[in-house]
Amino acid sequence: MRPGIAILERCVASLDWLAARRGYRSDLPEHLITGERGEEAAFFFLRRKGFVVVARRWRFGQVPGDLDLIAWDGDVLCFIEVKTRSSKEMATASSAVDRDKRRTLRRLARHYLRQLPEPDEPNFQPPMRFDIVTVYELPGKPREINLMPAAFGWSEHE
């Protein structure tokens, strides 16, 4: 584990604990709070794996939704969808990334790529992929985080 990441993760956890202790309550519905906790856990999980996160919750005004995380895994640009669940009784977390969600993520990724600076080399595009990170926060069990690299591609027919 990278020491700086562990320290940052402990600091964030301590701040969350202090906020709860002082009575701070979010106005968000519980499922959105669970999702935010999962995205934070996924962020630190990926950082420990060596990913360089360049954006969190990236939005483009004309497209609904967001890209949860955008990160470099070596020389590969990754668009990462995080799905968090507090139960395994229903469908898997990754099954929530259905055809419509994949279409939205592809649209957002195209918009993200358009706003990047022009590369020095004409027609250069870095290798890219769409990953899914699943986070399970089951009562009485340690958090379970899994990375599914290249979970789907650019084609609509996957």
Give the label of every model feature segment:
Residues 37-41, 65, 100:
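A generic structural signal for residues located within well-ordered alpha-helices
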Residues 3-57:
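Acidic-basic catalytic patches of nuclease active cores, encompassing PD-(D/E)XK
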Residues 2-9, 116-158:
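Domain-level recognition of nuclease-like catalytic cores that cleave nucleotide substrates
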Residues 83-139:
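Catalytic cores of nucleic-acid endonucleases
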Residues 56-61, 133-136:
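Short, solvent-exposed loop/turn elements at beta->coil junctions and helix N-caps
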Residues 42, 46, 67-90, 105:
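Conserved catalytic cores of phosphodiester-cleaving nucleases, focusing on short active-site segments
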Residues 59-63, 122-124:
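A short beta-turn/loop motif at secondary-structure boundaries
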Residues 53-55, 79, 130:
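Hydrophobic residues on conserved beta-strands that form the core of alpha/beta folds
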